[in-house]
Curated annotation (Swiss-Prot):
Catalytic activity: reduced [plastocyanin] + hnu + oxidized [2Fe-2S]-[ferredoxin] = oxidized [plastocyanin] + reduced [2Fe-2S]-[ferredoxin]
Membrane topology, as annotated: Multi-pass membrane protein
Native source organism of the sequence: Nostoc sp. (strain PCC 7120 / SAG 25.82 / UTEX 2576)
Cellular component annotations (GO), alphabetically ordered: photosystem I; plasma membrane-derived thylakoid membrane
Main function: PsaA and PsaB bind P700, the primary electron donor of photosystem I (PSI), as well as the electron acceptors A0, A1 and FX. PSI is a plastocyanin/cytochrome c6-ferredoxin oxidoreductase, converting photonic excitation into a charge separation, which transfers an electron from the donor P700 chlorophyll pair to the spectroscopically characterized acceptors A0, A1, FX, FA and FB in turn. Oxidized P700 is reduced on the lumenal side of the thylakoid membrane by plastocyanin or cytochrome c6.
Protein's recorded name: Photosystem I P700 chlorophyll a apoprotein A2 1
Length: 741
């Protein structure tokens, strides 16, 4: 007899109801729970999947290169990056009528195409690519690389090539490999690429496979490097009049510290970026060699964690940093590790979103407004999912892997012991921010509605303005630090030698970029609304994790696992308190918050890009301003994507906007109705099916049963999330592209 799905659980495979399918989908990634799983096998399987993951990434990048080379307009775009719109790929759609074909035949193409809003054109141009042939070459290289990684994944599942458990648990060796080998060496390689290929190309000198070994990146060669005269590499940088990709105004420097932006491309200086990557490489290669591996030198992390000394002095009592037992706790729990990794990656992804627009690194991308908006929004959305996932796996760690004996007296136990103080403080700050921020918005809304806008309560963000002034913004007249030429920040080494400072001060005070935007009362309010969202999301997640093992209401909660709906009517009030439920609730708040973040960023930038900052400044201080002047006003073009007179090239976004709303609203059907309703409905449908001629020829083996409460919540949450993302993505791209192309 054929074995039934799922193979990883005999219990589920023998379930006679449709529960078999749903539970199998839910448990597919929970490798720990699979039949016959050992710790060693678990590590080996996860290790092998990393190669598959990398193969998918390389395949994806290869497909971008291939489609742009085949169907894009890269060679036309680089001749005029500010006015030619980059093509992602052609569209083949047999349903298109003549008006649609005309609407989507754009950007100089001879058939319907999609426009690229990902920034890949700017990236490839900046790093030295100039022809379709180079794109094809890169595509084939990445395809071969993907194949190699797929093979490596398969190989590491073969008995002879499976690493042992001890190999996986050698933390110092892994740090050595990741810090020095991956981060350090790849940064060094990237610095090498920028110096040997990208910088010469930016100065009009082609470097390819044919001549890169014979073309020296600097006239002085390696002599300054070996004689310690490194300053030579910073002399004669590109001038302010440099025309990108030509020799006009070009210098010879390869490692500089100019600060600010290239005047023509409005992106960071390539020579500054090469310097940055070289510095990162040195730091990480050193960092990777600090820990004790096979040679008996360097730090042992376990010894450091367990030592009760701080810089050689013994520390005891409440103010020490008790990490005893943490090494083994971390090293033996994949959920603990994953929680940390997701948290770090989440922070850095949000950080990338902030830096990609304020300090653009790719040539001319600062003037491709739709791409800027898409990249910011994309990275902030990714960040919230990673952060919520971090807390989810932290909670699973506390339920499944935390050992109270092993962690006696260390920081983990301390956090659990004073969880009431942590949770109540988060609750207090959420209430404070919520009532005060909403109070100000509602007050302002009411007085504006009654025709007395002068009665609004408008608060200048003086502390934030002070921080901007300290970094050199002179607009506010707060002469302090870098905005005061006489201050020590201005005159201290190395600034007196005019290193980096002039470029930075020009950039921060220019008004045409997104560096340290001018802020006022509208920013003050929305900042606190975002703070409310962040703190409430954190409250839900932290409470869920810290109460995951047990609470006063349910002391034995850990015995019920990570996700349970309720413990029946016998213990009233145990519904909604599993750690999974806190993950579920927090995601609504996380989406709410990222909505406010992206609304704020987008509306503020629309004003800057259109040269009309007054609209945001005057109308962001009350609720109707946000609804009317941001959401409603900017969806006007969108809902006109197609009308009785035909279609335009926004029609696909108009359709997606409607479809996103539909998916989002469908979520509530699962979120607001409970299991009994669906069970009755299914039984009625089965009854009807079995009595309908022809239809009743189709039978099924599994008895149809409704989703469990937790599963229905997952389905509802998935629809809510996907609909939310689709709706805002369509709104963002259409409202920006409709104005700026």
């Amino acid at each position: 007899m054929a074995t039934k799905f799922p193979k990883f659980s005999q219990d589920l495979a023998q379930d006679p109801t449709t529960r078999r399918i749903w539970y199998a989908m839910a448990m597919g990634n929970d490798f720990e729970s699979h039949d016959g799983m050992t710790e060693e096998n678990l590590y080996q399987k996860i290790f092998a999947t990393h190669f598959g993951h990398l193969a998918i990434i390389f395949l994806w990048a290869s497909s971008l290169l291939f489609h742009v080379a085949w169907q894009g307009n890269f060679e036309q775009w680089i001749k005029d990056p500010l006015h030619v719109r980059p093509i992602a790929h052609a569209i083949w759609d047999p349903h298109f009528g003549k008006p649609a074909i005309e609407a989507f035949t754009q950007a100089g193409a001879n058939g319907p195409v999609n426009i690229a809003y990902s920034g890949v054109y700017h990236w490839w141009y900046t790093i030295g690519m100039r022809t379709n042939t180079e794109l094809y070459t890169g595509s084939v290289f990445l395809l071969l690389f993907a194949s190699l990684f797929l093979f490596a994944g398969w190989l590491h599942l073969q008995p002879k090539f499976r690493p042992s458990l001890a190999w996986f648990k050698s933390a110092e060796s892994r740090l050595n490999h990741h810090l020095a080998g991956l981060f350090g060496v790849s940064s060094l390689a990237w610095a090498g690429h920028l110096i040997h290929v990208a910088i010469p190309e930016s100065r009009g000198q082609h470097v390819g496979w044919d001549n890169f070994l014979s073309t020296a990146p600097h006239p002085a060669g390696l002599q300054p490097f070996f004689t310690g005269n490194w300053g030579v590499y910073a002399q004669n940088p590109d001038t302010a009049g440099h025309i990108f990709s030509t020799s006009q105004g070009a210098g010879t420097a390869i490692l500089t510290f100019l600060g600010g932006f290239h005047p023509q491309t409005e992106s960071l200086w390539l020579t500054d970026m090469a310097h940055h990557h070289l510095a990162i490489a040195v730091l990480f290669i050193v960092a990777g060699h600090m820990y004790r591996t096979n040679f008996g030198i360097g730090h042992s992390i376990k010894e450091m964690m367990n030592a009760k000394t701080f810089f050689g002095k013994p520390v005891e009592g409440p103010f020490n940093m008790p990490h005893q037992g943490i090494y083994d706790t971390y090293n033996n729990s994949l959920h603990f590790q994953l929680g940390w990794h997701l948290a770090c990656l989440g922070v850095v992804t949000s950080w990338v979103a902030q830096h990609m627009y304020s300090l653009p690194s790719y040539a001319f991308i600062a003037k491709d407004y739709t791409t800027q908006a898409a990249l910011y929004t994309h990275h902030q959305y990714i960040a919230i999912f990673l952060m919520v996932g971090a807390f989810a796996h932290g909670a699973i760690f506390l339920v499944r892997d935390y050992d109270p004996e092993q962690n006696k007296g260390n920081v983990l136990e301390r956090v659990l012991q004073h969880k009431e103080a942590i949770i109540s403080h988060l609750s207090w700050v959420s209430l404070f921010l919520g009532f005060h921020t909403l109070g100000l918005y509602v007050h302002n809304d009411v007085v504006v509605a009654f025709g007395t806008p002068e009665k609004q309560i408008l608060i200048e963000p003086v502390f934030a303005q002070f921080i901007q002034a300290a970094h050199g913004k002179v607009l506010y007249g707060l002469d302090t630090l870098l905005s005061n030429p006489d201050s020590v920040a201005y005159t201290a080494y190395p600034n007196y030698a005019n290193v980096w400072l002039p470029g930075w001060l020009d950039a921060i005070n220019s008004g045409t970029n997104s560096l340290f935007l001018t802020i006022g009362p509208g920013d003050f309010l929305v900042h606190h609304a975002i703070a409310l969202g962040l703190h409430t999301t954190t409250l839900i997640l932290v409470k869920g994790a810290l109460d995951a093992r047990g609470s006063k209401l349910m002391p034995d909660k850990k015995d019920f696992g990570y996700a349970f709906p309720c413990d029946g009517p016998g213990r009233g009030g145990t519904c909604d308190i599993s750690a999974w439920d806190s993950f579920y609730l927090s995601l609504f708040w996380a989406l709410n918050t990222v909505g406010w973040v992206t609304f704020y960023w987008h509306w503020k930038h629309l004003g800057i890009w259109q040269g009309n900052v007054a609209q945001f400044n005057e109308n962001s201080t009350y609720l109707m301003g946000w609804f009317r002047d941001y959401l409603w006003a900017n969806s006007a073009q969108l809902i006109n994507g197609y009308n009785p007179y035909g279609v335009n090239n926004l029609s696909v976004w108009a359709w997606m906007f409607l479809f996103g709303h539909l998916v989002w609203a469908t979520g509530f059907m699962f979120l607001i109705s409970w299991r009994g309703y669906w069970q009755e409905l299914i039984e009625t449908l089965v009854w009807a099916h079995e009595r309908t001629p022809i239809a009743n020829l189709v039978r099924w083996k599994d008895k149809p049963v409704a989703l469990s409460i937790v599963q229905a919540r997952v389905v509802g949450l998935a629809h809510f999330t996907v609909g939310y993302v689709l709706t805002y993505a369509a709104f963002l791209i259409a409202s920006t592209a409709g104005k700026f192309g």
